[in-house]
């Protein structure tokens, strides 16, 4: 009985993975560090639904987003995430561009180090312009382009790993 369902299940999982990989793509990943109580600002010009994933690797960095303010902070923002660890914010396609992005180093951490990943959802009907999307107005990390082929390869490895466990 098990073999009867394993092929359709694998095909369904593969199609689900393929859909997610083709509709969403990592635009850039970069690292940075920021002192307690300080902000690093970025500007997002790219159209479409964009998800920002801020992973604090040391200390605690928080994310503030605004469609109206170029330098959002903890009092002036439209979207924010201030959790300990991973902060995720999805910017709707309807938000006016340019978007102001602020990364705050939490006051309880003398130095916060972070990795920011920018993911675009091509399923929302956005333009196919693949130019760089940001400009740093203070300190920032070095951006790295992520290849679609690399993302597919990593996804396949994740599926194989999940099946083996």
Swiss-Prot record:
Localization (cell): Secreted
Transmembrane segments: none
Keyword Secreted assigned: yes
Residues carrying a glycan: 38
Classification via Pfam families: UPF0669
UniProtKB keywords: Glycoprotein, Secreted, Signal
Keyword match Secreted: yes
Cited InterPro entries: UPF0669
Residues making up the signal peptide according to the UniProt record: 1-23
Any Gene Ontology CC annotation: extracellular region
Residue runs in coiled coils: none
Chief location category: secreted
UniProt-listed Gene3D superfamilies: 2.60.120.380
Entry's family note: Belongs to the UPF0669 family.
This protein's name: UPF0669 protein v1g209471
Protein source organism: Nematostella vectensis
Lineage, highest ranks first: Eukaryota, Metazoa, Cnidaria, Anthozoa, Hexacorallia
């Amino acid at each position: 009985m098990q073999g009867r369902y394993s092929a359709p299940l694998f095909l369904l999982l593969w199609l689900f993975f393929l859909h997610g990989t083709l509709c969403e793509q990592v635009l850039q990943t970069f690292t940075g560090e920021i002192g307690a109580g300080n902000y690093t600002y970025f500007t997002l010009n790219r159209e479409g639904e964009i998800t920002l994933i801020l992973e604090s690797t040391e200390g605690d960095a928080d994310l503030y987003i605004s469609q109206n303010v170029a330098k959002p902070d903890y009092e002036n923002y439209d979207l924010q995430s201030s959790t300990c660890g991973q902060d995720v914010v999805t910017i709707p396609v309807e938000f006016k561009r340019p978007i102001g992005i602020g990364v705050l180093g939490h006051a309880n951490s003398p130095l916060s180090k972070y990795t920011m990943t920018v993911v675009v959802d091509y399923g929302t009907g956005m333009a196919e312009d693949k130019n760089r999307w940001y400009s740093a107005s203070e300190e920032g990390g070095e951006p790295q382009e992520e290849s679609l082929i690399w993302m597919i390869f990593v996804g396949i490895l994740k599926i194989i790993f999940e099946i083996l466990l």
